[in-house]
């Protein structure tokens, strides 16, 4: 079986995967409001209801690459209880899942397989990059490791750490739910590529910059 790793080209045609399916467009609810106040408001309410259901019933795919996967599975245990966020039903097949966590080191030989699994997932679908290795290659600055899974997959949330704690994974999951709640998709019976409005999600590092600057006493690692 032959695999081919495809790099994202922003200048490529819309038919090329995954640019065509991940196109960012203007909010369709705004156009509806201008054309028809009642229908626009109704669609806005329906979009909120649909997004509420989507963000509170994520179906994760049971997939892991390295040590970060151990931290991710720890979030499913009783002390952390990921069931509070509606994402505890792990699926064994990507065709039954809409949410994937790339947890661990992504090697060149594994990248086409990850891309194939992503293509088999249900729409709409989301991806979290968990850990330094998945985000940027981590300490493996070598030819055999992909320096960031966003080179061949669209990523919704990045979780830093080596490895991140389960609490960090839960925070990333809540950020993903916040992003899903602000999405706007066409509500129609049409099946196919449809434009998606995604709100800009600012970096948590920039949001908490002032808070970090005001810190005067730094705690030791065993006190965190």
Curated annotation (Swiss-Prot):
UniProt-listed GO biological process terms: aerobic respiration; electron transport coupled proton transport
Enzyme Commission number, as recorded: 7.1.1.-
Binding site for [4Fe-4S] cluster: 67-68, 133, 162
GO molecular function term, any single one: iron ion binding
Topology in the lipid bilayer: Peripheral membrane protein
Cofactor note: Binds 1 [4Fe-4S] cluster.
This protein's GO CC annotations: plasma membrane; respiratory chain complex I
Classification via HAMAP family: NDH1_NuoB (MF_01356)
Identification of the protein by name: NADH-quinone oxidoreductase subunit B
